[in-house]
UniProtKB/Swiss-Prot annotation:
It is a peripheral membrane protein. It is found in: Cell inner membrane. Its main location: membrane. NCBIfam families: ccmA. The lineage of its organism: Bacteria, Pseudomonadati, Pseudomonadota, Alphaproteobacteria, Hyphomicrobiales. SUPFAM superfamilies: P-loop containing nucleoside triphosphate hydrolases. Belongs to the ABC transporter superfamily. CcmA exporter (TC 3.A.1.107) family. Keywords: ATP-binding, Cell inner membrane, Cell membrane, Cytochrome c-type biogenesis, Membrane, Nucleotide-binding, Translocase, Transport. Pfam families: ABC_tran. This is Cytochrome c biogenesis ATP-binding export protein CcmA. One of its GO terms (biological process) is cytochrome complex assembly. It catalyses: heme b(in) + ATP + H2O = heme b(out) + ADP + phosphate + H(+).
Length: 204
């Protein structure tokens, strides 16, 4: 499987963020997207996830499910955790599992297994409002496991994680790559896994 973008152009708020940008990632490989604030790291991920309109260039996924679009085969994990404070940890993950189609898929762990994998099984009954910043991040990461998708688009994925959390997430990413997955991550810090760097220039 190979994800590729050629000559990408992104415009936000009437301002050109970048143009002529090429990106590529293959099965089993990770790409660390680096660069100063405002360079377009998040914008690139959102283009690939189908959350921003592409103003120029082309994006494709070779070797994926031909009946699904790239956004339908990708997880986008933003720098903000999309959680409902009043719902329990388990309910939040179950919502996302159903919304993303995981409940109808045979592959991948169920919600309880995903929570155990990120060390949140003991707080599954608690409202998300009670979680620390690191725990909220781990709950968002559990979404990657609860619904199996080959492409992970991650925006500052290790933010709020302590050293143990970063190590655990590195193991999760390693497992995803070992299964033939693809990871593109915008980051200011090392991911803890082998990754090719794609640096985007720009101003802060």
């Amino acid at each position: 499987m190979k994800l590729s973008g050629h000559g990408l152009r992104c415009v936000r708020g009437g301002r050109e963020v970048f143009s002529g940008l090429d990106v590529a990632a293959e099965s089993g490989r990770a790409v660390a997207i680096t660069g100063p604030n405002g360079a377009g790291k998040t914008s690139l991920l959102r283009l690939l996830a189908g959350l921003l309109a592409l103003e120029g260039g082309s994006i494709g996924l070779e070797g994926g499910d031909p009946e699904l679009t790239l956004p339908e085969q990708a997880h986008y994990l933003g720098h903000r955790d999309a959680l409902k404070p009043a719902l329990s940890v388990s309910e939040n993950l179950s919502f996302w599992r159903g919304f993303l189609g995981g409940a109808s898929r045979a592959s991948g762990p169920d919600a309880a297994q995903a929570l155990a994998a990120v060390g949140l099984d003991h707080v599954a009954h608690l409202p998300a409002a009670y979680l620390s910043a690191g725990q909220r991040r781990r709950l968002s990461i559990a979404r990657l496991l609860a619904v199996k998708r080959p492409v992970w688009l991650l925006d500052e994925p290790t933010s709020a994680l302590d050293v143990a959390g970063q190590s655990a997430f590195a193991a999760i990413m390693t497992g995803h790559l070992a299964g033939g997955g693809i990871i593109l991550a915008a980051t200011h810090t090392p991911l803890g896994i082998a990754a090719r760097e794609l640096r985007i220039g720009g101003t802060t």
